[in-house]
Amino acid sequence: SLLYSTNNFSIKDKSDNNTIYQFDIGSLTVGNKSEFDYIESNSNGRTQQIGAPELPTYSFNYSIQNNKNYEVEYVVNTFEIYENIIVDPAQPLQIAGEEKQFIKNDLLYSSFQQYPANNLNVNRMSLRGYELLNIEIIPFEYNFQTKQLKVYHNIDIIINETSDRELSLEVPRSKTFEAIYKNYIINADTYQDSRNFQQPAILYICGGNIESSLYFDE
């Protein structure tokens, strides 16, 4: 997903091969409704596993070089623990006219697992030759047995450039698309690209014999 919540992320440190962003969870409320507890935050993202605990997710898009490989890791700086929490399970989208059903994965809620299994998800994407990392953080640990919810308040997210990457084909830059691309990345102010821009072209769509006329040649 290209959705991102940059207000929760700020640059902390940067070197030639290493960038550190600091995550701050900001406003957060843990409330109760019926037998379940819910989490409200300023995030637009939520975990989507139906019947499993619904947790806020936070993400940003980071521009990268198409000829480099990257690794991302995180360090938790501060956290808070909430006791006796039963996190509300995520529900499917309600369709008008259909009977509302409540779904809860009882097997998961009675397990010894920690949820979520991964707190950091990284997806490399290519948009017409423009490369980026979509970095998603789920700053929570939920223990089904103890009903303990750990909330990461502050995290360092470390992006490391690790090695060269072989390219099969280099797509030229597009001035129009580059302007759109910069709106989606957190590091637009330091974005660099050594590729050449593509030459402007005009596409003609015609029929009949017009393409062979003198007017068309002119």
Roles of regions detected by a PLM:
Residues 1-218:
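Extracellular pro-sequences of secreted precursors
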